[in-house]
UniProtKB/Swiss-Prot annotation:
Residues 37-256 form the Peptidase C83 domain. It comes from the Eukaryota. The lineage of its organism: Eukaryota, Fungi, Dikarya, Ascomycota, Taphrinomycotina. It comes from Schizosaccharomyces pombe (strain 972 / ATCC 24843) (Fission yeast). Induction: By cadmium, copper and zinc. It is an enzyme of class 2 (transferase). Gene3D superfamilies: Phytochelatin synthase, N-terminal domain. The keyword Zinc applies. This is Glutathione gamma-glutamylcysteinyltransferase.
Length: 414
């Protein structure tokens, strides 16, 4: 062993003497060339003069005035859920996660241990997290994610909104509990580094005409007050990825239980699935043909409907499945398969209740479908189905506006 201990340092000395590009850092052999290639790192950024630090003396004065004006109604619920975005391009996910927990939306799935709670890595219903990690989310994708997770949204692209309307929306969200604004803006207009970014709005001081931005990139900038007019202007610069300006979203709880089931498709796979169904719709003879189409799709791709990962189930869920098994639609599929029949039945009801699909069906088939759709009036089924239909509506809308307002390139620049 002593021979080995003496030999290793000798070997390393020999390597460093023989090869000038090799050295020791913390007892590890490394290439000096590799050291030169290490990424430059940063610790926070200085707020520009256009932004007033929330925790500064003047920032506290603005907060006090806004509080006295009654324009900080959502601040405290948001402050309790303040997060840092998990990845450089997760500003949209960080913002939405913060808002969902602030509005007390039950995700219906486990976070850790026995606790249900929203985490940024749960927000993947519109696009894969690996894609979002590369270039963030668009304004429409943000809305889609919010809808899929139990929020009602109104999305506004700044090119369609006057300053007065924006001001009214800011005041509304600052004075009404359970109504929060998420804003997508260009940092450069505020004198900051970087480009596109999402963050929640924490309040408004009418006397100072300043809006509070609760920046989710806490590793970079603190929370700050900024002039309302400047904030409005920060949404106008054209996003290079889309050729469109940015905007904002007004969010409120939907008051519809999310349930255990979720749509297994993202906006891209739903676009392909709906296109295939529409192409086949005109030639079908009966509901059984439609069932065969759905089964072929379900078997060749990811499931149309699936359980939320780590979902929290109760005895009510088993009763819900028993209700499905009592329907004609369930037995329509049971003739073809005995695997996850309850879930493909829910997919059938959700998809063929969409107006755009119904319009493509022959009259006789549509009448048969409408008869089967009456089975969803069972309350246990209808509750779960309503949430699934909302998700499909959101995915459909997101597909239609895919090249619309703010196809994001969030937070790519330091």
């Amino acid at each position: 062993m002593n021979i080995v201990k003496r030999a290793v340092p000798e070997l390393l000395r020999g390597m460093t003497n023989a090869t000038p590009n090799i050295g020791l850092i913390k007892n590890k052999v490394v290439s000096f060339e590799a050291v030169g290639q290490l990424k430059k790192s940063f610790y926070k950024r200085q707020l520009p003069k256009q932004c007033l630090a929330f925790d500064s003396s003047l920032g506290k004065d603005v907060f006090l005035r806004a509080l006295q004006e009654g324009r900080m109604e959502n601040y405290f619920s948001l402050a309790q859920q303040m997060v840092t975005q998990n990845e450089p391009a997760f500003c949209g996910l960080g913002t939405l996660c913060m808002i969902l927990n602030s509005l007390k939306v039950d995700p219906g799935r486990l976070w850790k241990g026995s606790w249900r709670w929203y985490d940024q890595y749960m927000l993947d219903c519109c696009r894969s997290l690996s894609d979002i990690e590369k270039d963030g989310v668009t304004l429409e994708e943000f809305s889609c994610l919010a809808n899929c997770n139990g929020l009602r949204t109104i999305t506004k692209c700044v090119k369609d909104v006057s300053f007065d309307e924006f001001r009214k929306d800011v005041i509304s969200c600052s004075t009404i509990e359970n109504k929060i604004m998420a804003i997508s803006f260009c940092r450069k207009v505020l004198g900051q580094t970087g480009d596109g970014h999402f963050s929640p709005v924490g309040g408004f001081s009418e006397s100072d005409n300043k809006i509070l931005i609760l920046d989710v990139a806490r590793f970079k900038y603190p929370c700050y007050w900024v002039d309302l007019k400047l904030m409005y202007e920060s949404m106008f610069p054209i996003d290079k990825a889309s050729g469109q300006p940015r905007g904002y979203v007004l969010l409120e709880p939907m008051h519809i239980p999310l349930g255990v089931l979720t749509v297994g498709l993202n906006k891209y796979s739903w676009r392909n699935v709906s296109k295939h169904i529409l192409q086949q719709a005109a030639t079908v003879k009966n509901a059984d043909n439609l069932a065969e189409i759905l089964l072929s799709i379900n078997q060749s791709s990811i499931p149309l409907i699936q359980e939320r990962s780590n979902s929290s189930k109760s005895g009510d869920f088993e009763h819900f499945k028993e209700c499905i098994r009592s329907t004609k639609t369930y037995h329509l599929f049971l003739k073809h398969t005995n695997t996850n029949v309850e879930y493909i039945t829910m997919a059938f009801w959700a998809i063929f209740s969409l107006p755009m699909i119904q319009k493509a069906l022959p009259k006789g088939v549509l009448e048969e479908i409408q008869s089967l759709l009456k089975e969803v009036e069972i309350s246990e089924i209808n509750t779960q189905l309503t949430a699934l239909k909302k998700q499909l509506d959101s995915l459909t809308h997101c597909c239609k506006t895919d090249t619309g307002c703010c196809s994001s390139s969030c937070c790519k620049n330091t």
